[in-house]
Amino acid sequence: MAKPKKKEGFLETIKTIIFALILAGIFRTLFFQPFWIPSGSMKDTLLIGDFLFVNKMSYGYSYASCPTVRIAAIGLNIEAEDICGFLRGGNKRILGAEPKRGDVVVFRHPSNGQDYIKRLIALPGEKVQIKNGLVFINGTPVEVISDGTFDEVKAPQGPFRNMPRCANEVVEQNGICKKEKFVETLPNGVSHSILNFMRQTVDD
């Protein structure tokens, strides 16, 4: 007599888990999504291994915001087209808001599909150039002021065990890795830290 109850209890548990996963997926897609930092391109604002939640409501929702939902176990297969097809074409957004200079944003690369976490320094229609390592927006150089150095231990960082790049002379394992630190101020007055990794081809 107890077996049917156990079976019913098991099925209820499975239903609860599936329902919780669906709710978590909706919450992750529409409201907040967790990210961790895999590289040092945003030092010293964001460090390798840092964990953050991204507010997906900041700039509203577009066609690209909608998910494709597939749960093979229950035969659920909902395409993004079925959910947000009415938003296709142009730059249609719901509850849209314009991004601002200095915002740290997450976007999906259109070619490889990877998520990138970067800082927004220019707005649509503006011309951005890099000359001798300096950023120019519409032909005007962005203000840069020296702010000492950023020091860290030369040791594997994060899940990928990346080694930090050093601007000082050859640094042994567990030595102090130094990079020049600057404060960059954008045209709207927003400031942030940047690091100099030595001169390289992308400086021009």
What is each residue range found by the language model?
Residues 2-14, 35, 44, 48-204:
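Soluble "head" domains of membrane/secretory-pathway proteins
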Residues 12-30:
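Hydrophobic membrane-insertion alpha-helices, especially the h-region
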Residues 26-40:
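Aromatic-capped interface at the extracytoplasmic side
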